[in-house]
Amino acid sequence: DRVYIHPF
């Protein structure tokens, strides 16, 4: 799973 979904 993704730990941090960054906006870019």
UniProtKB/Swiss-Prot annotation:
One record GO biological process: vasoconstriction
Superkingdom assignment: Eukaryota
Annotated keywords: Vasoactive, Vasoconstrictor
Family to which the UniProt record says this protein belongs: Belongs to the serpin family.
Annotated protein name in UniProt: Angiotensin-like peptide 2
Organism: Bothrops jararaca (Jararaca)
